């Protein structure tokens, strides 16, 4: 499956209101963990947009983050394959669809297909790189006495990152490919994503996570 539409010069081609995006997300996702992850990636993407000079498009970057896993709960074996259908039914434009699908680039999903929608714009590359990493940072925060990212140092995150058994579901290979696509050293990606999560933690109320969700994060 290939979607040829590309974001032109990083400018939003279409827009869906955030309230409508939330409604669309919840139409296909009920698990609190999946909703929390979507909100986390939304907040991190908005932070990156502002940090990287795309502040005028921060809401747009956030919507892409919010909807990026729209098909994962109901169609895990068709992740990034079923998404275009669900998004088009919700009135979402092809630029957002391309961005959503591109975060699965090079990944073979359960049905045996490999996603070939390549991240092109910096926004898409950030989504690819930061998606998995937000889960790892979050899991690391929950292991701390404070249950917070705010007092987490980079060296602590790197220690967890290097422990292959920790948050094993967060693919280091994907994270490192993401850093490469951005032309960044891994340390830069780790540093910036940690800073993004520190900056947005109060908004996301990371310390108020139920035990079942906590277990999902660290498994």
Identify what each model region corresponds to:
Residues 149-191:
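Divalent-cation-assisted or electrostatically stabilized phosphate/pyrophosphate-binding catalytic cores
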Residues 1-2:
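Methionine residue identity
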Residues 5-75:
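Acidic/His-rich, divalent-metal-binding segments that scaffold phosphate/diphosphate chemistry
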Residues 207-219:
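Single conserved hydrophobic/aromatic residue that forms the stacking wall/gate
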Residues 54-164:
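Divalent metal-dependent catalytic cores for phosphoryl transfer on phosphate-bearing substrates
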